[in-house]
Amino acid sequence: MIRNVLGYWGVLVCALCAEPAVISLPTANQHLFGDEPEKFYMYVNRTFEGETSKPWEGGSFGYVRSPIRVGGKLVMSRFHEGIDIAPVKRDKAGNPLDLVMSISGGRVVHTSPISGRSNYGKYVVVEHDWENSKVYSLYAHLSTVTAKVGDAVNAGSVLGRMGYTGAGLNRTRAHVHLELGLQMSTRYGSWHDHNFGSANYHGNFNGMNIAGVDIAGFFLERRKNPELKFSEFVLSRPMQFKVTVPAGAAEPEFLSRYPWMRRKGVPDHVSWEVGFAATGHVISFTPSKRKVSAPVVSHLRPSDIPQRWLTRGLLTGEGNSASLSAGGKKLVSLVLDSFPIVEAASTR
């Protein structure tokens, strides 16, 4: 027992003492660092309350799309899980020429060269080993994919070329959609087959299994503080809600992948209080003595705006009261691996 505990804390200390990863933007577009967001992000076409516009904000991370009025307040109702980086060079026909490169060292773990198999179009996923944790970057809407699964890459290694493959894009709005995130489960295929009728062509590297963090925010914070670690950035994100879940016989596999998320708690715990950002990614696991038989919302940042607009539909309710929606329950089950094992998980 003592060896196990010391082993756990040894891994945690080692992770927190690890050197910060070397990172760089994935294309020649560096306007994020020049305080020129309108040149960095690809705009979205918007019509709202009779006015049309092309706001660059729609290409940034977070709740930045589909404005609505809720109780007289302007609310962005759609969550964008990555950032859309505009091209800096096009050919005479208007096709983007920008090369798309890995943001950091790692290994190519997935390529999807058939555009019709995902809303991402043609995309690549790179696995990074940061602080003894696996973190994933995703590069979507490519015109061509040159990387191959198993390739070792460095920051700046070419993965493909920018394009406009995928849902709802055209040549004018060509861009690379970039995500940086955490893997929710190593059994995603079973979860997908249990919850959906559609084919999963991407195994554990389906975009639904990668919980995106504010990647532009990470780049900007690292610009100010080159010693900032990814774990420190994630742990600093505002908490929107917490869900208390029954503790199983073993620690959640998610926590074994990201041990730096474990907070101090009570000994002999019977549950975990899992903290979530408004964007739906996990921030913390805290041991708790609260007895619950099923996941229950145990903490909430109050708001007079219905929680579904603030949590991408993971919660229902408003004010100081909320509960998990059907989508929220599915997300929690994915994080906890609490779903049936489907023997014939889809690999089509």
PLM features: residue spans?
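Solvent-exposed coil/turn segments that connect beta secondary-structure elements
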Residues: 88-90, 105, 113, 129-131, ...
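Conserved, short, structured surface segments that act as functional micro-motifs
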Residues: 117-127, 141, 151-226
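Hydrophobic h-region of N-terminal signal peptides that target proteins for export
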Residues: 9-22
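Short beta-strand-turn/beta-hairpin segments enriched in glycine/proline and small hydrophobics
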Residues: 83-85, 124-139
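Surface-exposed, glycine-biased beta-strand/turn segments
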Residues: 20-122, 164, 201-347
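Short histidine-centered loop motifs in beta-beta connectors
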Residues: 93-97, 101, 133-156
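A general structural signal for short secondary-structure junctions and capping/turn motifs
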Residues: 3, 75, 168-170
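Bacterial N-terminal signal peptides that target proteins for export
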Residues: 1-9
